[in-house]
Each structure stands twice: as C-alpha cells, then as structure tokens.
Amino acid sequence: SITGVWKGFNSTKAEAADNDTITLRICNWEEYIDEGGWNADETIDLESTDIRGDNSMVDDFVQWYYKTYGKKVNVEYSCLGTNEELYNMLTLGDEYDLICPSEYMFMKLMTEGWLEPFSDEFYDTGIKENYYAKGVSPFIKQTFDNNTINGEPWSKYAAGYMWGVTGIIYNPEDVTKQEASTWKIINNDKFRRMITVKDNVRDTMFAAIGAIKSDKLRSQDFIRQADYTDKLAEEMNDTSKDTVDEVLEYLQQVKDNVYSFETDSGKIDAITGKISAGYQWSGDAVYIMQQAEANDVELNFAIPEECTNMYFDGWAMLKSGINGNSEKKKAAEAFVNFVSMPENAVRNMYYIGYTSVISGGQSPVIYDYLKWNYGLESLMEEDDTISEADAIDYSLGYFFSGVSNDSRYILRTSKAQTEGMLSAQYPTEEVMHRSAIMQYFDNDETARINQMWINVRCFNIHNVPVWVWIAVAAAIVAVIVLRIADVIRHKKI
C-alpha cells in the first residue's frame, strides 16, 4: 500500500515537464524515515551539535540536492509493508529507482539480476559528499564486502541503512535472564500462553533451529572450532529435509505453547503485560522498552546464547528504474549519502528507534548521540536513583573504529543498560561473534520451508484427538477390506 508521496522543491506541472528536473522514485518501509514536525522540546543537544527534524528528510534532501548540485529533483516516495509485497510489485511492473529491502530480499534481487551496481565514485572517500563511504561502520563495511552472491559482494549492489539482531524481550518479574537467553524459551511450558513468536517463516524457523540445536551450538567443542563463525552460519541456514521436518515437529509444539504468532501486536502485548516474553527484532525491542519505561514497567532484552540473527535493510538501485540514466543514478546515490550524513542518521534513529549502519567516521556525532542516550552522566541526570555504583564499561570499538577495546569508544554506562535498550541498539562484539545472517534460499529450499510453514500455521497434528486417528485408521482399513473383496469378486467372475 502506498502511504505517501513527496513532491519536493515547489514541484509543479511546469517543473515536472522541465527536462532539468530529475524524478527519483523511492520505495521504503512504512514509518522508516524521519518525517519531521518535531516538537519544540525535541532538540537533540549533543556535545558536537544540536539536531532537529523540522522538515521531512525527503524535503530536506530536495533542498540539499539543489544547493549541492544545482539540479532540481522531484522525489516520489512510496511505502510498502513487506519484502514480499515489494517483490510482487516489481514483478507486476511497478518501477522504482531506489528501494530499501531486507538482506535476504536484496540477495534474491542480486541473484535474479534486478539491481544496478553502485558507481566506483560512490565509494570514493575523497569526495566530500560521500557520507556513506566515509561514515559506514568498519564492522558493517566488512560484512557487506565479505558476503557474496555468485561471487559478487553485497556492497556492489547494496548500501546499508539500518541493522540489528534478534532476541527475546522479557519482563524480569516473570522471566529470568537465564531463561530468556535461550531460544528454547519459545517451547518452555513454564511460559505457556505467555510468549509470542514472529508470524513469518524465516524468523521463527531461525529460533526453532537455535532451540533444536541448542546443546550443540552451546558446546565448547563447537565454539572452539577455528572456523566457528562459518560453521555457525551453516547450522543456522540448514534447510535439509531432515532439519525442516524436525523444525515442523518442533514448531507444532511451539504453536500450542505460545500466546500468538505476531508481526506487530507483540509490541503492545509486551507493554501492557499480556505476555511475559516475546521474540523481537532489536529495533522494535528498543521501542517497546521505551514505551514500557514511560509506563513505569521494566522490560529487558536478552540475546540467546546459541546464536542471534543479524539483519539489515539496505538501499539498492533497480536497473529497470535507472535504465541507463546517469543523472537519475547520481540522484539515487546522493539520497543514500544524504541519509548517511551523521546528523541525518541520528534523526532517523531518533524517529524510528532502529540502529543506523553509520558510525560517523571522523565525525563525533553518532558516538555523541550514543552518550546522550546511554552515557552514565546523561542517565544520572534523568534518574536520580542511578549512581557511580551502577557504572560499567561497555566497549563498542568494533563498531565505531574496527578496533576491539578502542579506548575512545568504551562507554561508561549503567549496568541496567547492558540488559536493556543499549544492548539492543548496540550489541557487544561478543554477541556479534555468535551471530549469523540468514541467507537467501533457492527455489527448492523456499518451497520446502514454505510448505513446512503452511503445515505449522494451518494444521497441527498434535491437536488431533485420539478418537479421530482411530476413526481415520478404521476408515483406511475398511477401504482396504472393500478393495480386497472387490478384487476377489472380480477374479471369481
């Protein structure tokens, strides 16, 4: 569903017909970019700068593009709800220039040849306006460079936007951290009808594999392997028939244990106390904890010890949209750079709650924003129950500089934040060591897991009463007996 279209820079019919006006068609997720209109008291006053969102990000881009390049751009900005909806729109002939799919979808689009590669110029850190190349986290850059499709790196066709991990949001009054730190919680009958899982096959299958293989994944023999991260990815992306059958059986049990399979309702269910725990993406977990805190409810976030799913949304250009138009491609790449400007990355993080792939490079803005949210001094100013006695060092060098334990990026924070919003928004390097990315599945794998999911969501053999099985067996026996009798009768004739 299209929820909005921006047409910027005094876009009139005359300008639309003007050959000097570039039309840029962008498709993103709903409520996934700063739409402006901040209240007067919403200024983010950082050590390095003050940040506000008076206008929408799209309108600000239109103004910036004209000021920077002397060209008018008309942005047609559309929103969709799911990756599958986006793919269906593309196959039906809808045309966009720039889209923001999740990692598995841009892998699929790469495989099928839909995407336009980014220019070499886009990654030139010597160009002032290349905010993405200059500011992307070294950790994220390495991930996009090292992951490949058909021998080509993600970074050739995709630039990161937001990222995160998956885990369990939980109420510490009902659930211990240890109980929440394993995927086996989704089938723990102690929390029967008190926990939610995601209503999509990829996320919930990931959790099921983590639970089924829990003992193996947590064993020291497995963890100490030299190629541990590769082996972990193999295990979590196992779509063999035996594993999928095992996942089916496990999820049929889970179906009887959970409160619901949900996409969005789990947020309010956690905040209002309808559930004690729920599978969540870290970005949504931050939002849930913020809302709960506003209602004086404490919720925490745990990242399972078996493995966590590292996910991305990334900008990608479509061949069918760009269609060889160099000016349009320049505008699309400029939009990615504009939203990657540290101040704009902060605006988007503040507005949507997810974590930008931008660490800022030489700019201190992103780390200043981190301190503004989670630094001990800021926390003590907001809550007089927090003191130096609660202090703990939280190392994020791997994300900001690519150097573990970089003293410039050891955040002094409160211990509570290591189990709360900070841990969801910026997981530690140790957590990321046990992360895996769900790969794009080929047609055979997709058919197998989709059929499994249909069986889980539409039919549960564990719910069938014994008398039904007896009746079915009796009917089968009766059919066989009648068939034999019919054969004998015909032989006699």
Where are these regions (language model features)?
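Early extracytoplasmic/lumenal segment of secretory-pathway proteins
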Residues: 17-108, 112
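Extracytoplasmic ligand-binding site segments that recognize negatively charged/polar headgroups
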Residues: 27-43, 48-54, 104-269
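Extracytoplasmic/periplasmic substrate-binding proteins
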Residues: 256-325, 366
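N-terminal export signals
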Residues: 1-8
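Short helices/loops that flank or line small-molecule/ion binding pockets
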Residues: 59, 84-96, 111-112, 185, ...
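Conserved C-terminal helix/tail region of periplasmic/extracytoplasmic solute-binding proteins
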Residues: 392-493
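Mature extracytoplasmic/periplasmic domains
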Residues: 318-426, 476
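Low-complexity, acidic Ser/Thr/Pro-rich repeat tracts that form intrinsically disordered stalk/linker regions
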Residues: 9-17
